[in-house]
């Protein structure tokens, strides 16, 4: 499955647009991890804990989006966009959206 942020795929022709697909993931962060991450942020370092959480959320959201595209008969997802939102109580939401398409063979 080709997944791209562009609206076209060089050298490929889109046979059919199958619709918008999305993958949503909500992840929680615990108090101890938040505390340690805040210490890292205060002393000026990067927060590896949150960076890994962001990467995990991104991968899970893309995987869910791809699964939905496959169920529509797609072999590619174009125009992919990723959004991250902070929710209350230490929750984080990652959303991957794109357009499921079938490319000509």
Curated annotation (Swiss-Prot):
<protein>
    <recommendedName>
        <fullName>UPF0145 protein GK1405</fullName>
    </recommendedName>
</protein>
<dbReference type="Pfam" id="PF01906">
    <property type="entry name" value="YbjQ_1"/>
</dbReference>
<dbReference type="InterPro" id="IPR035439">
    <property type="entry name" value="UPF0145_dom_sf"/>
</dbReference>
<comment type="similarity">
    <text>Belongs to the UPF0145 family.</text>
</comment>
<dbReference type="InterPro" id="IPR002765">
    <property type="entry name" value="UPF0145_YbjQ-like"/>
</dbReference>
């Amino acid at each position: 499955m080709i997944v791209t942020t562009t609206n076209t795929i060089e050298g490929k022709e889109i046979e059919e647009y199958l619709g918008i697909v999305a993958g949503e993931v909500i992840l929680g962060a615990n108090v101890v991890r938040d505390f340690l991450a805040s210490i890292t942020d205060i002393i000026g370092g990067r927060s590896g804990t949150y960076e890994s959480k962001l990467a995990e959320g991104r991968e899970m959201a893309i995987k869910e989006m791809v699964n939905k595209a496959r169920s529509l008969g797609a072999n590619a997802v174009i125009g992919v966009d990723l959004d991250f939102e902070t929710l209350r109580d230490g929750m984080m939401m990652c959303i991957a959206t794109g357009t499921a398409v079938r490319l000509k063979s």
